[in-house]
Every structure is written in C-alpha cells, then in structure tokens.
C-alpha cells in the first residue's frame, strides 16, 4: 500500500499553526494539517483526506508532546468546535497569530509595512466573552445547549464554558432546566421550537440579557415565564425572543420582541456607556475593545480639528470614544437598529459632535463631497466592497485606519489601496481579541504618500 493515501499512518513533527487553527507539519515535502496539535509535537497520524501535495490527518498518538502543550481548561476540548487552541500555551498562540498576519500581508498583499508592532495580548485569556449564542437540541428527552462537535452537527452539551464570562455559567445551566417543558426546534424535521439561546453580559455593569431564537409561533405562557426569570436570575434585566423561520445556518431573524424587562443592556467601554440589544454587533471582548480604541486614538494623534468618518460603525463602538478628541464624527452603518442605538448612545453620553447615517458604505462614500481627515474602516470578515475602496482612493483622506478580523481580506484590501501609490502602509498592529481560537484582530494605518 502506498503511504500517501487515505488511511495510511505516518509520523511527523508539527512546525506551525494555520489560520484554521490546525497544526502544520511536513512529510517528504508534503504538507499535513492536523487538528488539536501544538508546534513541537511529534505525532503518529492517520491520513484522512489526501491530495497530491497536502493532506489532513487525525492524531493517533502523541509520540513526544511539545513543551508548548498545556492541559485544556475545558473538559470537552477534545470534542467541542468552539475553541481550537486550548492545548496551546498562550505565548505560542500570540506568536502564531502574529505570524499569520505577517504571512497574509506579505503573501496576499505583497506589502511590507514600515512598522509591524508586537501583538497586544489579552489581559484575560479566559472568561473574556461578553456574548454567546448556543444552538439548542434535545437528547434522551433533556434539553442540550452547546457548540457543534468539530466537523459535524452533533451538539456538545455544555453547562459552562471557560471562554465566556463566568457569570454566565450558572445562567446557562439553569436555563437549560427552565427550557425543559418548552418546544425545542428539530433541525432534521424543522419541527417548531427554540433553536438558539443567546446570552449577553455587560462586563462592567453586570447586566445580563437573555435572547431565545424561535422558529414558529410564540408559545402561550412564555411571557409569564420570562417575567419569572427576571425575579429568579440575579443580574438579568431583559428577556427577548427573536423569530427566525429561515432554514439554514443563519442564527438570528429580522424580528425581535421583548418578553420581559428591557430589550437591551448597558455596557461601559473606553469612557462611554453603550446600549446594546440582543442582535446588535459589539466587540465580544470588552477589555480588548478598549485596547483597540486606545491604539486608534494614539495613531490618530488628534488635534481637535479633525473630521472623522467611521464606516461600518455599528452602535458607535469606535466613533463615540473618539468623538471627544476630534471636531466631528460621522458614522455610517447599514443596519437601521444599530444606527438608532448609536444615536441613542451619543445622546445618553452627551456627545453632540457625532452624527450617524443609515446607508451602505459603498453607496454613501462616493456621494460624500466633504474633506475627511481620518477614515476608520471596520468591515465584516468579507472585507470591503470594491466600490468603497475606489471611493476612498477618490476622496483620499490623509489617514486611514483599517480594523479587520480576517488577515486575508485585510491584505487583499490593503493591496488595492496601496496599488496606485496614493497610500503607503505605515503600521500593522495585531491584537488578540479571541484567545484560545485562531482568530486575530488587526489594525492597519495607511497614510498618503
């Protein structure tokens, strides 16, 4: 039997980590990706998917563990697909993320920044998530909530999670019991019921918001049940239901209704008090969001005279903490509910120089004819629409700060922005927003040449 085929067993050493979180090793000049491994591990591996020059494998035996291998904090780390790197020492995670950003900028963007700064570590590598959304199911009659097993749609049942704020752990366990009499959605038959449980916490305020995602009509008596939860669970200030009748992987639908209490919680970040609803985008790591804002402020070095435009502004997460240092802020966001919350947040904090527009960035920016001193981009993972990048090159603000959660799309967009010679890549700053996972946040500063 040829060794390079599915089912064959090989021995190799893991040298690095990939952007998907897998360990990367080499065997006879071919690349092998192996999940749940650590750089420095020597392994015996069974090949599971084989191509000509690369393969994926499964660990059969850790022949010699790496010195960078640690015991996972999670008892289901070998099954749960939520985290990829709980076996990897935190310093090694940071080095790997830094390298992932460097590789993307060089190989995809073909760029070399004037300064590549060391990654900003998270002060708390565990217990940092202020928001979690768990798929729901029923197994042997009992409600289960958790994340999907790696590479499957089998739910790994959780009563706690080491990366979420620890104050959410008892709430998760209690709500699974409280949901026992209520209908649970069946993915195979699309039988109506609750399909996701969303928990959110203001890490600085302690306020907690429960969101049930429902496929089907609102069950009778649910509002009364929700009122009881407000009394029963300390810190819970609201219970909402989101209606999602779509078949597929979409978590939230378009309609959210408050069942009890408030439809939002308050959070404090970078000196600003934010109103955050169940489906609103807000950085999941409050402490690292503050580091992000601090870095942006330092790089802008405001004089108080600037006009700052924030594209993909959400609820004003970046705009509002920066507003006090500049003359004017304009935030642009396509989701109307987020725009309304951004306006409410500005009013609540007495910020009068921030204005928010509900529009697509690619449609608004080409029409905007005023001079922009500083432009902030914080797009979704897919990056910016080409029309946005072309409008930036036409408007040509002297300072452009791009915040990205995906190094590959960041590198692609930076390459386009620098392709005409208008901009140069001045700085790159990786930031660890998502410890224990392969995801990395990056800030890029472009200045006019």
From Swiss-Prot:
Coiled coil: none annotated. Its EC number is 2.1.1.-. It is an enzyme of class 2 (transferase). [4Fe-4S] cluster binds at residues 74, 80, 83, 161. PROSITE patterns: SAM_MT_RNA_M5U, TRAM, TRMA_1, TRMA_2. One of its GO terms (biological process) is rRNA base methylation. The keyword Iron-sulfur applies. InterPro entries: MeTrfase_TrmA_AS (IPR030390), MeTrfase_TrmA_CS (IPR030391), NA-bd_OB-fold (IPR012340), SAM-dependent_MTases_sf (IPR029063), TRAM_dom (IPR002792), U5_MeTrfase_fam (IPR010280). The active site is at 405 (nucleophile). It comes from the Bacteria. Residues 3-61 form the TRAM domain. S-adenosyl-L-methionine binds at residues 283, 312, 333, 378. Keywords: 4Fe-4S, Iron, Iron-sulfur, Metal-binding, Methyltransferase, S-adenosyl-L-methionine, Transferase. GO terms for molecular function: 4 iron, 4 sulfur cluster binding; metal ion binding; rRNA (uridine-C5-)-methyltransferase activity. NCBIfam families: rumA (TIGR00479). Belongs to the class I-like SAM-binding methyltransferase superfamily. RNA M5U methyltransferase family. This is Uncharacterized RNA methyltransferase tlr0942. It comes from Thermosynechococcus vestitus (strain NIES-2133 / IAM M-273 / BP-1). The lineage of its organism: Bacteria, Bacillati, Cyanobacteriota, Cyanophyceae, Acaryochloridales.
């Amino acid at each position: 039997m040829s060794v390079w085929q599915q089912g064959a067993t090989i021995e190799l050493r893991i040298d690095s980590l990939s952007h998907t979180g897998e360990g990367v090793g080499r065997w006879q000049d071919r690349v092998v990706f192996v999940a749940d491994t650590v750089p420095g591990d020597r392994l015996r591996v069974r090949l599971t998917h084989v191509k000509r020059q690369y393969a994926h494998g499964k660990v059969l035996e850790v022949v010699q563990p790496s010195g960078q291998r640690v015991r996972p904090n999670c008892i289901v780390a070998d099954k749960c697909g939520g985290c990829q790197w709980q076996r990897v020492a935190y310093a090694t995670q940071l080095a790997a993320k830094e390298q992932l950003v460097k590789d993307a900028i060089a190989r995809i963007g073909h760029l070399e920044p004037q300064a590549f700064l060391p990654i900003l570590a998270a002060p708390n590598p565990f217990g940092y998530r202020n928001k979690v959304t768990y798929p729901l199911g029923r197994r042997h009659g009992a409600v289960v909530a958790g994340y999907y097993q790696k590479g499957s749609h089998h739910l790994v049942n959780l009563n706690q999670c080491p990366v979420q704020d620890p104050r959410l752990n008892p709430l998760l366990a209690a709500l699974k019991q409280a949901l026992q009499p209520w209908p649970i959605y069946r993915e195979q038959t699309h039988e109506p019921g609750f399909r996701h449980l969303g928990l959110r916490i203001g890490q600085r305020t302690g306020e907690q918001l429960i969101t049930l995602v429902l496929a089907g009509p609102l069950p009778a008596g649910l509002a009364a049940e929700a009122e009881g939860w407000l009394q029963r669970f300390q810190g819970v200030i609201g219970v909402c239901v989101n209606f999602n009748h779509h078949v597929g992987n979409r978590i939230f639908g378009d309609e959210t209704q408050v069942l009890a209490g408030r439809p939002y919680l308050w959070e404090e970040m970078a000196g600003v008090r934010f109103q955050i609803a169940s489906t609103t985008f807000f950085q999941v790591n409050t402490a690292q969001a503050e580091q992000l804002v601090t870095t942006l402020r330092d790089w802008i070095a405001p004089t108080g005279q600037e006009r700052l435009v924030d594209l993909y502004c959400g609820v004003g997460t970046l705009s509002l903490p920066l507003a006090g240092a500049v003359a004017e802020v304009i935030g642009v966001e396509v989701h109307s509910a987020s725009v309304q919350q951004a306006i409410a947040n500005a009013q609540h904090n007495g910020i009068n120089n921030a204005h928010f527009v509900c529009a697509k960035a690619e449609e608004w920016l080409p029409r905007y004819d005023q001079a922009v001193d500083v432009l902030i981009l914080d797009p979704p993972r897919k990056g910016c629409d080409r029309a946005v990048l072309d409008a930036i090159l036409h408007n040509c603000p002297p300072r452009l700060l791009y915040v990205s959660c995906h190094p590959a799309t960041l590198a692609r967009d930076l390459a386009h922005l620098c392709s005409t010679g208008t901009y140069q890549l001045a700085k790159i700053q990786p930031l660890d927003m998502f410890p224990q996972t392969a995801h990395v946040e990056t800030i890029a500063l472009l200045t006019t040449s």
